């Protein structure tokens, strides 16, 4: 499994992080680490380390980008 560090922006409302976590699981990913970087003005920025099968994060990024209000800011292989 390859690991990727993702920084995402998401709405600061109940259930937003749960939706992201479910999408990561749907794409076959496993969250290895999570931290809240910023939380203000109705938006949050979170750092995640996610392990995925294979080495191409395209499916994971497509699933995350399909969630309304969620934006992948950056992605890099760990």
Tell what function each PLM region has.
Residues 1-78:
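A conserved regulatory-domain signal marking ACT and ACT-like small-molecule sensing domains
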């Amino acid at each position: 499994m390859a690991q990727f560090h993702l920084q995402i922006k998401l709405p600061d409302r109940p259930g937003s992080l749960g939706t992201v976590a479910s999408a990561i699981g749907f794409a076959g990913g496993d969250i290895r680490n999570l931290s809240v970087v910023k939380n203000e003005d109705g938006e949050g920025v979170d750092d995640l380390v996610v392990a995925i099968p294979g080495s191409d994060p395209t499916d994971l990024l497509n699933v995350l980008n399909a969630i309304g209000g969620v934006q992948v800011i950056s992605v890099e292989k760990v």
